[in-house]
Curated annotation (Swiss-Prot):
Function: Catalyzes the interconversion of 2-phosphoglycerate and 3-phosphoglycerate.
Entry protein name: 2,3-bisphosphoglycerate-dependent phosphoglycerate mutase
Gene3D superfamilies, sorted: Phosphoglycerate mutase-like
Single GO BP term: glycolytic process
SUPFAM superfamilies on file: Phosphoglycerate mutase-like
Binding positions for substrate per the UniProt entry: 7-14, 20-21, 59, 86-89, 97, 113-114, 182-183
PANTHER family the record matches: PHOSPHOGLYCERATE MUTASE (PTHR11931)
Length: 229
């Protein structure tokens, strides 16, 4: 069984080196090219899908659309869930990463970005960036909407969705592609591969490059490779 993961193509805020999180930004032109290239590589590799999953953020949705279009699979059913959203960067969202490092120190910012259990500064209740002000989350219990997340909290929302919704599809023999974000995918990869809390700090997932897992009957990885050529 094969599972394909893809981080969205470069976004406008990736390009500007800003913390993005749940803020909804579009793909940059380079990100569009990355997504289209990913779709072409998937087609060349002969990978076919029966069902697709993505977040409710534009950059991931558009990446998936380009992938399906370029691989001639636009008809594949797509399921969108906030549980596949990027990690919520709290009060860091919209800030420049370099300027934040100069203000708080590179080590502190690295912990905020890569540590498993260090929370970023949280959004204030009345901050206009609060996701509760976004219509796409209007059906969620307000207590479920974060004001900031670390990777641990991100994993705690991603993995139940994997277990309850995505994994059963794979076990039924359906071929799955997931287009999501750097940290929601890091959380899933941590779970699939059993990566330790400290080791996960070093894991980087590139934008717009399909990651193919070959899974056994227990959905444990037996092989993985990037379609980067």
């Amino acid at each position: 069984m094969k599972l394909v993961l893809i981080r969205h193509g470069q976004s406008e805020w990736n390009k500007l080196n800003l913390f993005t999180g749940w803020h909804d930004v579009d793909l940059s032109q380079e990100g569009v090219v990355e997504a289209m290239t990913a779709g072409k590589r998937i087609k060349e590799a002969g990978l076919e899908f029966d069902v697709a999953f993505t977040s409710v953020l534009t950059r991931a949705i558009k990446t998936l659309n380009y992938v399906l279009e370029e691989s001639d699979q636009m008809w594949v059913p797509v399921h969108k869930s906030w549980r596949l959203n990027e990690r919520h960067y709290g009060a860091l969202q919209g800030l420049n990463k370099q300027e934040t490092a100069e203000k708080y120190g590179a080590d502190q910012v690295q912990k905020w970005r890569r540590s498993y259990d260090t929370l970023p500064p949280l959004l204030e209740e009345n901050d206009e960036r609060q996701a509760k002000n976004d219509r796409r989350y209007q059906l969620l219990d307000t207590h479920a909407i974060p004001a900031g997340e670390n990777l641990k909290v991100t994993l705690e929302r991603v993995i139940p969705y994997w277990m309850d919704t995505i994994a059963p599809e794979i076990k039924e023999g359906r071929r799955v592609v997931i287009a999501a974000h750097g940290n929601s995918l890091r959380a899933l990869v941590k779970f699939l591969e059993g990566i330790g809390d400290d080791e996960i700090m070093d894991l980087e997932i590139p934008t717009g490059v399909p990651l193919v897992y070959e899974l056994n009957d227990d959905l444990k990885p037996v092989n993985k490779y990037y379609l980067d050529k």
